[in-house]
């Protein structure tokens, strides 16, 4: 195992938000990715929690600042601050509860109302280990994600299936959009100080990256 770099030693800082109904497993996805932990007794998040983890992309260190909030309506007052500066999002539903998938459309609208048009979004069908209880067909979710220009994966925070891949794919896509902008001369991400909000460009930038294809459960 290589030596750890200092926590503040990174090339880019990206803010990602986790959104979706209460009980879909957002907090466990966060803890699985950042600490490799899963809690059966996981309780609803009160207010906002955030954690960080750094990953390597093309020999750069990307530090992800991951924000998680409760899905219950009574916490909606934090909306604006929660979304501010986000360049990526995991929109999570529970494959065993169709209502959580139906509500994805509302969460997506809220996300797009409060973020830049180019935010990189991964639709995540969590609890994929509970195949015998599936209520949301994979194809239904995949079709929706394609219509809405999102990436898509099914995950299990319990057994860690696709958790790493979902987060790192979003981070990689954000980085590639930025890198293309720098090469095109339309932006210079290298000049951004650490922690500054990153503008990932116009809609075409993200669409071009997404057209290369992605993921499935």
Swiss-Prot record:
Instruction: Give the classification, highest ranks.
Output: Eukaryota, Viridiplantae, Streptophyta, Embryophyta, Tracheophyta
Presence of keyword GTP-binding: yes
Query: Which family does the similarity line name?
Result: Belongs to the small GTPase superfamily. Rab family.
- Is Protein transport a UniProt keyword of this protein? yes
What stretch of residues is annotated with the motif Effector region?
42-50
Q: Which residues bind GTP?
A: 20-27, 68-72, 126-129, 156-157
Q: Which UniProt keywords apply?
A: Cell membrane, GTP-binding, Lipoprotein, Membrane, Nucleotide-binding, Prenylation, Protein transport, Transport
Covalent lipid adducts (S-geranylgeranyl cysteine), residues: 214-215
Q: Name one GO biological process term.
A: protein transport
- Give the top-rank taxon of the lineage listed in the UniProt record for this protein: Eukaryota
MF annotations from Gene Ontology: GTP binding; GTPase activity
Q: How does it sit in the membrane?
A: Lipid-anchor
* Protein name (database record): Ras-related protein RABA1e
Q: Cellular location of this protein? A: Cell membrane
Report the coiled-coil segments.
none
Q: Name one GO cellular component term.
A: plasma membrane
**Protein role:** Intracellular vesicle trafficking and protein transport.
Q: Which gene encodes it?
A: RABA1E
NCBIfam families attached to this UniProt entry: small_GTP (TIGR00231)
| InterPro entries referenced in this protein's UniProt entry, alphabetically | P-loop_NTPase, Rab_GTPases_membrane_traffic, Small_GTP-bd, Small_GTPase
Tell me which Pfam families the record gives. Answer: Ras
């Amino acid at each position: 195992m290589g030596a750890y770099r200092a926590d503040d030693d990174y090339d880019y800082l990206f803010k990602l938000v986790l959104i979706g109904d209460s009980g879909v497993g957002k907090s466990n996805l966060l803890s699985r990715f950042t600490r490799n932990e899963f809690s059966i007794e996981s309780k609803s998040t009160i207010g906002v929690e955030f954690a960080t983890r750094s990953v390597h992309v093309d020999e750069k260190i990307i530090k992800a600042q991951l924000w998680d909030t409760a899905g219950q309506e009574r916490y909606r007052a934090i909306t604006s601050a929660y979304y501010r500066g986000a360049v990526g999002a995991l929109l999570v539903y529970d494959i065993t509860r169709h209502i959580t998938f139906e509500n994805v459309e509302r969460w997506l609208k809220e996300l797009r109302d409060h973020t830049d048009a180019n935010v990189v979004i991964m639709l995540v069908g969590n609890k994929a280990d509970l195949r015998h209880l599936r209520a949301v067909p994979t194809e239904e979710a995949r079709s929706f994600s394609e219509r809405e220009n999102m990436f898509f994966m099914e995950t299990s925070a319990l057994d860690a299936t696709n958790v790493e891949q979902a987060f790192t794919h979003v981070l990689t896509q954000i980085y590639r959009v930025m890198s293309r902008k720098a090469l095109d001369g339309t932006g210079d991400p290298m000049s951004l100080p650490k922690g500054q909000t990153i503008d990932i460009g116009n809609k075409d930038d993200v669409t071009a990256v997404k057209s290369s294809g992605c993921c499935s459960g």
